[in-house]
Structures are given as C-alpha cells and as structure tokens.
C-alpha cells in the first residue's frame, strides 16, 4: 500500500481537494457517523496517542481527513524550545497511514510565512490575560494567525482540537465565531497515559523520575474534583486543594493554578455551572499544562433516530423518569410559524424568514404536569395555545424546511441547554445541537417493525389502513430522504449508544435508557 501523500504547497493541497471525489449524502445510511466532508486535524507533529484520538474521531465523522503538520515559529518566544521541538515526519506519516488519513499537509515555514511581516490575528485581551497568556505574551497571536491560515487554506467542514489546550480551544472557538467562519470546531477529550499524565509531545523531555513526578498534576486535579463533588464549589477551596497536592512534588515548579470559566476564561469565585481548573508547571526542562472541567449541571441526554422508532414517546417518558426537562423542539418551530403568520411574513421567502427568526427569542417553560405541553413565549408574548391552531399547524412543515430557521433555532436550543438538565430528540441532536451531550442514544428499529407499528397506529386512530408493503416502502423512502438531505441529515453520533427496539415494549426501552443514564451518572441519578 502506498504511503499517505505529504503535500507541502498550498496550490498542491487545493489541487488535491478539487480532485477528491465524493458527496456527503450520496449513499449515506441513517446509522452512518459521517457528518462532514473534510476533517482537519492541525498538529505540530511528533504524533502520539492524543493526536491519534483526534484523527480517529475525524476518520469516523468525515469523508476526507487531512492532518496538518507545522511547527509554528510564531507561537514560540525566543527563549522557548522551537529548535528542540521533536520533528518525526516519517514516523508521523506511518501513523497517519495506519489511521486512514487521506493526506498530510506539511508546509515549510517559507510557504506559510513567506511575506513577513505577516498580518496577524490578535485574540481579545480577555481571553489571554489569565492562564498561559501572561507567561507566553505572543503565543496565542501566533496560534490564532496560523490556525486561521490553515482554516482558509483547507476549508474543512470540521476541525479537531484537544481539550488539553483549553485556552487555545476557547480562543479558536471565538475566532471562528468572530470571523463567521463556516467550520465546526470539535473539542476532543484530553487523553492520558496509564499514570494519568496528560499526553504531550513535550513529555519526551522528561526522564523516568521526572515523568513520575509529573503525574502529581493529574493527582491535584483529581483532588480538586473530589473537593467539588463533596460540595465545595468556591474558588478558595478548590484551588487550595490543588496547591496542597502539588506541594508534595518537590521537582514540580508551579507556574500558575487557576479556576476560570471555560468559555470566557475569566476567573471564577464560585462554580455555578462549569469551572475549568487549569495548571501550568515545569518539571525538569518540560513545561506542562493540564486541566479538568468541573460541571455542576445536570447532564444533557440526546436521542436521535429514524422516523417511526418511537423517539417522541420515549423521550417524554424518560424526561419524567429521570427528572430532566423535555426540550420540545417542535414547539419552537411552531413558534416561528406563529410569528410568521402574526408578522405576515411569506415563509417561502428565505431572506424574509431568515430576518424574522434571527431577531426572535423563544422561551420554553415546563408545565407543572409533565404530560402537558410546555408553556411558550415568543419575544416575551405568551403563545402556548396560539401555536397549536390549525393555521399554524398547516405552516410548520414549510417553516421547518427553511435552513435559516433550523440554523437559528439550533443556536437557541444550545442557549437553552447551557444550564444542562435537558433531554431532546430529533435527527441531529447528538451530532449538531448538543454534540457534548453526556449521553447520546441512537434509537432505531427495522423497517418491518416500524411499518408494523404504524399499521397499528392507523388502526387505533380509525384511519384508512395501508398494507405492510406500502408502509415499508414509505418508511424506506423517508429514511433515504432524512439521511441524504443537504442540511442537517440524520446521522448517528460517533459516541452514541445504539438501541434497536425490535421486539421491545416502550417500558423496556425506557428502562434501558434510564439504566444507561444511571450507570453513566451514578451521582446524578
């Protein structure tokens, strides 16, 4: 087998991308995990298991995977380890080959930085005034500049970054937001070795004794989590625990410990939703960073699957059984349809509907009776009953078919999910709306089983019957339509638990999901 190609020029990479075959939705099945066309994994080389975990996820989620290898001089200060940074291109190429990478983009410094002085990207000061920022003053400007160049050159659908570099991740997410870049930044979990040491290319600088000493960083974070889980959510208690543990490592020279908001990177006095405990320390010649997210929120449960798999009924019942808020996404689309009628906006006009939905605020409040529909407000006007009228019902499908509506409502759903404690169902909840959901379920059933259930529903509702064969054809057609639609196709999240409900009662399905939830979150059950 030929080695994965190494492309060193921008023109060469663009030629490769033009020639790469494939359409995202051609031949896709509902259980496919492919949700992007091009996945980019930016690295500085010296690949290790942490990098490989990013590549493996990119391989599961994209048709084409590109790994960039560039030791970026802009992010190194004069006294730092640019010249010593490990470069192992042949070994990296072999690892990429094993993981099914399509190509490596390994430009030279002259290729990316030929026209110095370079136009640079300066992140907001609020994102660099704490953690590593004061200790590495120009580092994040260098990172943001090169990442923006890579995103522009590769034009990926999705780009993968590790959560070990939490400050870098927050800055890149903000960069994508501020520059309106059409790419999804995918945070990937921090990978540790058997001792708990966070994997890093700079771990190569550690001798055996130093590597053992370095594990105390993780031990201190575990101690912080224990303190947090014991009910101490204030800054002083959490950081004192970290400091006390780190003090037991005589070879560990602490640069900083801090507790910050994981998005704004501003210091926290109290963890009310999420807090990031971050450490930087020197062990021997190696500068090491590590972090841990402390989450006070209830988890989010995402349920996806094809039509007719029983998602709606199961999701509502699970919400009641577990104690999560059911996020009625259908009510949100009804709210937009009501607003379009109220404002006399033509729903077939994508520009008018985009303007309408961009400025509207939808609020949902659970009914005291979990069997009842939630209360709904649009722009502070209560519309719970108004969105259930026949006129609104007749308009919902046309409204939901507009990509601007879906895009805007996904943002609002994500806003509602910031406090956690939600359960939602759909076709892209776990892949698009809540990709960081604590538990993802892909609920499915055979076409034959779904047709049988539909036949029974028709009978129970005294509706005209259809044959099993007719219903199977309709369901197969719906599956194909949902999995091959251009915008938000039905996909199984790479980390979803698949439950085939053939032969299962609703009660059995609910028991299976609630058991999974209790096993994953024993302290929240």
From Swiss-Prot:
Chaperone recorded as keyword: no
Main location group: cytoplasm
Name of the protein described by the UniProt record: Bifunctional pantoate ligase/cytidylate kinase
The species this protein was found in: Acaryochloris marina (strain MBIC 11017)
EC code(s) of this entry: 6.3.2.1, 2.7.4.25
Its job: Catalyzes the condensation of pantoate with beta-alanine in an ATP-dependent reaction via a pantoyl-adenylate intermediate. Catalyzes the transfer of a phosphate group from ATP to either CMP or dCMP to form CDP or dCDP and ADP, respectively.
GO molecular function: ATP binding; CMP kinase activity; dCMP kinase activity; pantoate-beta-alanine ligase activity
Active site positions, chain numbering: 51 (proton donor)
Region (Cytidylate kinase) residue spans: 293-525
GO biological process, one term: pantothenate biosynthetic process
The encoding gene: panC/cmk
GO CC terms: cytosol
Positions bound to ATP: 44-51, 162-165, 191, 199-202
Record keywords, A-Z: ATP-binding, Cytoplasm, Kinase, Ligase, Multifunctional enzyme, Nucleotide-binding, Pantothenate biosynthesis, Transferase
Pantoate--beta-alanine ligase: region residues: 1-292
Residue sites binding beta-alanine per the record: 75
PANTHER family per UniProt: CYTIDYLATE KINASE, CYTIDYLATE KINASE/PANTOATE-BETA-ALANINE LIGASE
Source taxon at top rank: Bacteria
Pathway(s) served: Cofactor biosynthesis; (R)-pantothenate biosynthesis; (R)-pantothenate from (R)-pantoate and beta-alanine: step 1/1
Subcellular locations according to the entry: Cytoplasm
């Amino acid at each position: 087998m030929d080695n994965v190609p190494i492309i060193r020029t921008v023109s060469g990479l663009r030629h490769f991308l033009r020639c790469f075959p494939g359409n995202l939705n051609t031949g896709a099945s509902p259980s496919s995990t492919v949700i992007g066309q091009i996945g980019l994994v930016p690295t500085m080389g010296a690949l290790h298991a942490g990098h490989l975990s990013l590549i493996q996820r990119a391989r599961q989620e994209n048709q084409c995977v590109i790994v960039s290898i560039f030791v970026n001089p802009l992010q190194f200060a004069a006294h730092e380890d640019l010249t010593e940074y490990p470069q192992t291109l042949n070994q990296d190429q072999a690892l990429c080959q094993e993981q099914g990478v399509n190509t490596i983009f390994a430009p030279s410094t002259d290729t990316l930085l030929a026209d110095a002085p370079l136009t640079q990207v300066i992140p907001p000061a609020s994102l660099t005034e704490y953690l590593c920022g004061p200790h590495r003053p120009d580092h994040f400007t260098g990172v943001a500049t090169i990442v923006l160049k890579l995103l522009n050159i590769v034009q990926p659908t999705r780009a993968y970054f590790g959560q070990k570099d939490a400050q870098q991740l927050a800055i890149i997410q903000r960069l994508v937001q501020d520059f309106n870049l059409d790419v999804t930044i995918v945070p990937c979990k921090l990978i540790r070795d058997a001792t708990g040491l966070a994997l890093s290319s700079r771990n190569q600088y550690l001798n055996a004794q130093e590597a053992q000493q370095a594990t105390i960083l993780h031990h201190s974070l575990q101690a912080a989590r224990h303190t947090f889980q014991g009910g101490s959510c204030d800054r002083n208690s959490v950081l004192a625990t970290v400091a006390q543990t780190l003090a037991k490592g005589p070879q560990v020279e602490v640069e900083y410990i801090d507790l910050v908001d994981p998005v704004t990177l501003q210091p926290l006095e109290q963890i009310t939703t999420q807090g990031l405990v971050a450490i930087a320390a020197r062990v021997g010649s190696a500068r090491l960073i590590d972090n841990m997210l402390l989450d006070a929120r209830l988890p989010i449960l995402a349920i996806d699957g094809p039509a007719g798999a029983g998602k709606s009924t199961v999701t509502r019942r699970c919400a009641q059984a577990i104690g999560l808020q059911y996020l009625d996404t259908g009510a949100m689309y009804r709210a937009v349809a009501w607003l379009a009628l109220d404002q006399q906006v033509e729903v077939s006009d994508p520009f008018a509907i985009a303007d309408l939905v961009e400025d509207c605020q939808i609020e949902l409040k659970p009914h005291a009776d979990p069997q009842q529909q939630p209360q709904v407000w649009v722009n502070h006007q209560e519309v719970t009953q108004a969105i259930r009228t026949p006129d609104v019902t007749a308009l919902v499908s046309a409204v939901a078919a507009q990509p601007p509506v879906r895009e805007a409502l996904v943002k609002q759903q994500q806003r509602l999910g910031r406090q956690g404690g939600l359960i939602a169902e759909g076709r892209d909840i776990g892949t698009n709306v809540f990709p960081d959901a604590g538990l993802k379920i892909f609920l499915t059933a055979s076409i034959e089983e779904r047709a049988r259930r539909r036949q029974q529903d028709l009978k129970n509702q005294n509706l005209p019957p259809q044959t099993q064969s007719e219903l199977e054809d309709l369901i197969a057609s719906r599956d194909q339509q949902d999995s091959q639609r251009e915008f938000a196709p039905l996909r199984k999240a790479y980390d979803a638990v698949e439950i085939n409900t053939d032969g299962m009662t609703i009660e059995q399905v609910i028991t299976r999901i609630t058991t999974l939830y209790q096993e994953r979150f024993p302290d929240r059950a």
